[in-house]
């Protein structure tokens, strides 16, 4: 019979970094509230949570890389909102942020949860920041907890 390794949803004793973009703060602050709520509900001590605020989504990967390099965090949660406008700027930012965050996780071995919304409209972002479609900040924190525990089981 194979051995199954799964992460549990218990944040006790784990240390988390959160990187949140300030641009579109009316959305990103709701995502941050959701992430903090999930971490605390699942047993994290608020003294084991560090929040780094960066100007916008484009700065998220580099701040995440700096946090990962410290070796202090069991997982890092990236939060922000990139909303499509009338120019191709959205496409460049959304693609580079997602690639950059993925590279940090792969290169560092630290679990990184991607909670950066990439939406076509403000309404879609609002729906995903605590209204009709739930709170993706909360969901990202749950992913971070589970993955951090999974990695502890693999060691």
From Swiss-Prot:
It comes from the Bacteria. 5-amino-6-(D-ribitylamino)uracil binds at residues 23, 57-59, 81-83, 114. It holds the Pfam family DMRL_synthase. Its EC number is 2.5.1.78. (2S)-2-hydroxy-3-oxobutyl phosphate binds at residues 86-87, 128. GO terms for molecular function: 6,7-dimethyl-8-ribityllumazine synthase activity. The active site is at 89 (proton donor). GO terms for biological process: riboflavin biosynthetic process. The keyword Nucleus does not apply. GO terms for cellular component: cytosol; riboflavin synthase complex. InterPro entries: LS (IPR034964), LS/RS (IPR002180), LS/RS_sf (IPR036467). It catalyses: (2S)-2-hydroxy-3-oxobutyl phosphate + 5-amino-6-(D-ribitylamino)uracil = 6,7-dimethyl-8-(1-D-ribityl)lumazine + phosphate + 2 H2O + H(+). Keywords: Riboflavin biosynthesis, Transferase. Pathway: Cofactor biosynthesis; riboflavin biosynthesis; riboflavin from 2-hydroxy-3-oxobutyl phosphate and 5-amino-6-(D-ribitylamino)uracil: step 1/2. NCBIfam families: lumazine-synth (TIGR00114), PRK00061.1-4 (NF000812). Catalyzes the formation of 6,7-dimethyl-8-ribityllumazine by condensation of 5-amino-6-(D-ribitylamino)uracil with 3,4-dihydroxy-2-butanone 4-phosphate. This is the penultimate step in the biosynthesis of riboflavin. Belongs to the DMRL synthase family. This is 6,7-dimethyl-8-ribityllumazine synthase. It comes from Geotalea uraniireducens (strain Rf4) (Geobacter uraniireducens).
